[in-house]
C-alpha cells in the first residue's frame, strides 16, 4: 500500500478519486492493476510495430485479438524521455525500501518487456481498460 497525504492507499483501480481513467472516462473505465499487466506480459505476444507512422508495440492475446500500444516515452517537466519506449502506469503503488514510494509501470523497450517502478513525478501513458 501507499501512504498518500497520511491516507493508506492500496491499489486504486476504479477509484475516481485517484484513478485518472475512471475520473476522466467514467465508472466503466479504470487503470489496469500490476497483476493485469503481469498477466499480459506472461500470456500475450509483444512485438515492435508501427501504426499510422507511430512506433509502438502490437500486443496479441492467445485468442488472436490484439491492441496497439504507442511508444510515447515519459515526460518530466517539458522534457520527453525514452521516446519510442512504452511506459504504462498501473493503479498499483509500491514502496521501494531505498527511495520511498513509486508507481508500478509496464516498460516496453525493443524486445525487453517488464514491470518496473516509475517516479511519481514522471508522466507516463495510461491505457484504460473496461470490463
Where are these regions (language model features)?
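Conserved positions within compact, well-structured domain cores
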Residues: 1-131
Amino acid at each position: 500500500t501507499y501512504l498518500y497525504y497520511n491516507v493508506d492507499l492500496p491499489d486504486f483501480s476504479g477509484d475516481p478519486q485517484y484513478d485518472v481513467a475512471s475520473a476522466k472516462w467514467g465508472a466503466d473505465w479504470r487503470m489496469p492493476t500490476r497483476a493485469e499487466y503481469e498477466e499480459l506480459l506472461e500470456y500475450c505476444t509483444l512485438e515492435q510495430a508501427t501504426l499510422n507512422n507511430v512506433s509502438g508495440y502490437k500486443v496479441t492475446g492467445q485468442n488472436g485479438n490484439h491492441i496497439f500500444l504507442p511508444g510515447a516515452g515519459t515526460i518530466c517537466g517539458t522534457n520527453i524521455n525514452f521516446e519510442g519506449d512504452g511506459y504504462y502506469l498501473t493503479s498499483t503503488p509500491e514502496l521501494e525500501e531505498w527511495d520511498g514510494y513509486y508507481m508500478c509501470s509496464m516498460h516496453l523497450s525493443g524486445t525487453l518487456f517488464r514491470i518496473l517502478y516509475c517516479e511519481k513525478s514522471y508522466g507516463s501513458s495510461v491505457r484504460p481498460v473496461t470490463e
